[in-house]
Amino acid sequence: MSEFDVREGVLDAVIVGAGFAGIGTAIRLRNSGIENVAILERGSAVGGTWRDNTYPGAACDIPSRLYSYSFTPNPHWSHTYSGSGEILDYIHTMVREFDIGSRIRFGHNVVDIIWNEGAGHWHVSIDGRPDVRARTVVMASGPLANASLPNIRGIDTYEGHKIHSARWDHDYDFEGKKVAVVGTGASAVQIVPELVKIADTVKVFQRTPGWTLPRINRKVQAGTKRRYARYPQTQTLARSLWFWGHESVALGVVWKTPLTRIVELVGRAHLRQQVRDPWLRRQLTPRFRAGCKRLLMTSDYYPALQKPNCTLVTWPIATLSPKGIRTVEGVEHQFDAIVFATGFDVSNTGTPIPITGRDSRVLADEWSAGAKAYKSIAVSGYPNMFFTFGPNSGPGHSSALVYMEAQIDYIVEAISLVVEGDLHSADVRQDVQDAYNEDMQRKLAKTTWNSGCSSWYLTEDGFNATMFPGFATQYVNQLRGVEQGDFTMVPRRVDLPQEPAQVVAHS
């Protein structure tokens, strides 16, 4: 991968993160004629979440046709639901086909971002590297960037092998080992079926069971791939059918409606069909409404739990000990390895990178009680900065890529206004942002996410800064164009000429 020099002058845009969002933003900016752009990636390769999540069984629980960009469809998906390796290949293909590689700088960990009001640009500090200046910044690092270990007493005393699902140790040999899996969320239900095939014993520690629906993962026939490649409109139609199918599910998982009951009936029928033991069925039956937590899509998890070498443990964990896990009833379970399938540190309070805006405002302080933004993308007081998958942009029923693509197109339009309109700053008005968030919270109060269960969607005091309370079509429609009246736009002063950065590729 070639390198480039971004030290001289000011870039039109800096993109933080080279995952799905960062690569997609760079592509759309390039398509719009904005090429004075750098992507700063702390890792050594593109891919973000799909580069990091390489655990056994890692796959997407959204159909591949929908978990991809409409502007770069892939007719060659091998299955209805793709594995992590195939998704990562898709991201690499986008980088090659749109020649984005020369804009990426790896090993660039952004540690601080500060707005320079006089100059009208952002000052981006990079750990151990020269600083970068940019007229606009796109925060594309995403909410699933930092693995989260559980806050369990004694976790540092355990002497065996510890593995987080998002930082999988491929050198560790599970064969013949006694293994614990802590967590029963989206990654755990994919890991457990693979571990029971090779480990001596697997014990799954469950805090609360989730609603689990069947996932029918069919292999895509060669003829179908050829048809999609030759007639792209047929793949567009397939994507549309998947989209509207998922859109209808919103009625059952976003709000409590008669369709919620149907979703729960499907979940219970799936459980009854796959689990014969009444005691185990009771332990796996959720005690909250479908949709309150993320739905789990799998047809392999329940059968894996019933393998002779697998045990479900429902007693709460009291502490980790040097040899294993002790539960509250006093039993100590000894293990060679513990797998923490405990998700990510989702920044719905604070920010993963320190950001200082106008008048020395610190975004982490403003978000300490719950993150708020305008349409999930812009924050008042932080001009020319845009977020992908910012506050209240999470889908509970559809593809993240549908939401992300709408965000990217909106952000590209906003950046074009700044760059081509030669603006000093575009800052969303505080009154507009406040009105938007008041409306969000009113609508969220009526959703299943705020119906009483504990989930990573909510802060400790119950504030929902994560999910969008509506259909995907509603989210996309609100981003169909930048309403310039919602922003304070200031022209750049003619007496402050700024030389653009030299983005020069090095072979």
Q: Language-model segments: which ranges?
A:
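Feature captures the FAD/FMN-dependent oxidoreductase FAD-binding
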Residues: 79-145, 319
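Short hydrophobic core segments
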Residues: 15-16, 110, 132-144, 179-182, ...
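Short beta-strand to alpha-helix junction loop
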Residues: 74-93, 105, 182, 254-263, ...
